[in-house]
Amino acid sequence: MGPQNIDLMESMRHVQAGGLPIRAQLRLADETRHHLFTSDLTVSEFLLAKDAKCTPISQVMGSSIFHVGKIADYKGATGEIDTISQAHRDSRRLALSRCFQEAQAIGADAVIGMRIQERLITMGQHGKGGDDGDEVIEFTVFGTAVRAPWITHPPNTPIVTDLNGQDLWALQQDGFEPCGFLFEFCRYHVWHVMKNGFSAGGEVTSAQEAIETARHIVVNKLIQQAGYYKAEFVVGSDVKLTVKEVPCGYKGCDLNDLDVDVSWFGTGVRRIPGWKPHEQAKIPPLILSMVPLGRKRGEIVEGDEDSDELAEKAREAEQEAAEDADDDANE
C-alpha cells in the first residue's frame, strides 16, 4: 500500500485508539527490510554508540497537539492550576507513548538521543488574537531506536532516554544503564502578585514562594517516578523556569497575577545487574627524557660526573619496560 492509498479516516481511528498512524506503520515496516537507517545522532555520538554496543535501527518520533484550557478561568486564588499541569503531563505522555510504540514496532531495546520540542500557542477569544483565550500545546519527541542487549528491560518494552551516544558510552564504562525517562510539569498561579508580599526595594516574596513551591511539587513527583523505575540517580536534567505576568480581570480587577511554569526532564540511571569492573590493560612505564635549557640532546657537558650513571640507569629502565611488555603480550 503506497502513501497515496492511505485511508485517512482509518488512520485517524488507529490514532484515537492509541495506536500509530498507518503512514508511520508503513515507514517503519519499510525501514526494517533493509540495512539503511535514519538517525538524529552526530558522527561522534554514532561512533560512541556503536562502541557501547548500541546498533541503530531507525529514527522514531511521537507528537501530540493538546488543548490545555483557558487561562482567564483561574482567578481569585493562589495555587497550582491542576487542570493545566495535568494537560501538559498528558500531552507529553501521549507524545512519548507514540515514540515508544514506534520503537516497539521495530524491536528496539532503547531510544537514545531523544530531542524534545515544545511549543505553546495562546489563542485569542473568538479568533481575534491576543492572549486572553485558550492554550494549545504542541509537544514533539524524536530519537534513534537502537538494539542494545546489555540494557535491562522487560520484553518488548524499550527504554526511552535523552542521553546521547557519548553519555551512554561513559555510563556503560562505569557499569550503569538508563532505566527510564522522567518528566514533570507544574503551573502555579499567584493572585495579585504586586498587592501582597511586596515592599519598595525588597523581594517580591509571593513570587519567590510560588517559584519554590512549584519546584517542590515537580521534584517530589520526579522522585516518585525515579522510585518506580528503581533509579539510583537522575542525569541529564533539563530544568526550565518561566514566569509570566498575566492580567487578573477578575470582577473588573485591574491588578496583575503571575503564572509560574516549571518543567523538568531527565533520565533515571541504575547499576547494570551483575556488572563487574573490567580489568584495565597494563601500560608499560614511559621514560621521559629531560634536557636542561641550553643543552642539546646527547651533548655531554664537562664536569657532569653523574651523566654517565644517569644514562646507564635510563637504558636499564627502558630494557626492563620492554621485557615487561613482552611478558604481558605472551600471557
What residues fall within each predicted segment?
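Short, well-ordered alpha-helical segments
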Residues: 60, 65, 74-117, 182, ...
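Intrinsic disorder/low-complexity detector
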Residues: 2-84, 125-208, 244, 251, ...
